[in-house]
Amino acid sequence: MNYFIDHCTNDSAADFIVLASGLGGHANFWKLQIKFLQQYFHVLSYDQEGCHASDSLLDEQYSFQHLAQQVFNILDQEQITKFHFIGHAIGAFIGTELALLCEQELQSQPQFKQMLSLTSINAWDELDPHTAKCFEARIHLLKSAGAEAYVRAQALFLYPPAWISQFINEITQAENQQLLAFPPIHNVLTRIKTAVDFEINHLHREALEYVALHFIGNEDDFLVPIQKTRDLQQSLGHGTMNILSHGAHASTVTQSDLINRTLFEFYKSHNFIE
C-alpha cells in the first residue's frame, strides 16, 4: 500500500491531515487539494488496498475496519499522534472506523492518537435507494460489458453535465489511464459491496463525540442525494454542514477552489489554523 507525505510549506510543527479517497481509492484524487492544504498541514495521502492492477485479490472479509487499521498502522509508523481526516464518500467511512480505533487505543495505551477533526464529503449514514440503484447499474455494466464500459460511464455519476461537455478531452485521457491500471474486477465488486453494506452506528457516534465534524454535500450530486449529508450529520449528532449548489459528486475536482475555501473556513473557525 503506497502512501505519500507532502510536508507543510510554512510550518514544520504543523499538524497532519490524512486524505482518503472514495471508491477509486487513489491518492491522486486529491491533487487539487494537496497543494492548498500544504500551506497549513503536513498532508498524508495514500492508495487504498485493492485499487491497482497488480494488487492481489481482496479477501471476502474486506471491510472498512480493515482499511482503517491500515491507516492506523501508517500513523504508527510515522509516529503521528494528532491529525485531521478528510474522506470523500467511502473515504469518510474509513475515517469513522479510524476514530473507533483511536478510541480503543485511548482506553488501553498511555500514548494515543487523537483525531482532531473529520470532514465527510458527499458521504452517507446508510445507503440510499437511489445510490443503491446507481451501484446496481455499475455492477451490471462491469459484469456484462467489462471494464471499459464501467470506466466510460463513471463520469455520468461523478461530474455535472456542463463540466463533462467542457472537459471531455481531459476526462477521456483520465479514463484511458485508468483502463491501463484497472484493478481486478473481483476487487472492484468487493469494494462496492463493502460500501453498500456500511452503516453508521452508535459506536461511531460515541467515538466522534469530541471530534470536530464537518459535512460537505452537493445539491447536484447524482450519486448520493443531498439529504444523506443531512442524515449523516443527524446520525453523528453534531458538526458543521456546508451545502454547495454545484459540483456534483466529485466536487473536489469540479469545484476545487470552492472546496478548498470551505475547508479553510472550517479549520479557521475551530482555530486549527490562523
Locate predicted features.
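Active-site loop/oxyanion-hole signature of alpha/beta-hydrolase fold enzymes
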Residues: 44-88, 97, 101, 261
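Catalytic histidine-centered segment of alpha/beta-hydrolase-like enzymes
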Residues: 244-260
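Conserved HGGG/HGGXW glycine-rich cap/lid loop of the alpha/beta-hydrolase fold
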Residues: 2-60
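Short alpha-helix in the alpha/beta-hydrolase fold that links the catalytic acid
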Residues: 225-232
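Flexible "cap/lid" loop of the alpha/beta hydrolase fold
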Residues: 96, 100, 112-145
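Short beta-strand/loop motif that positions the catalytic acidic residue
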Residues: 209, 214-217
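Acidic catalytic loop of the alpha/beta-hydrolase fold
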Residues: 219-224
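Conserved alpha/beta-hydrolase catalytic His-Asp/Glu region
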Residues: 129-131, 148-206
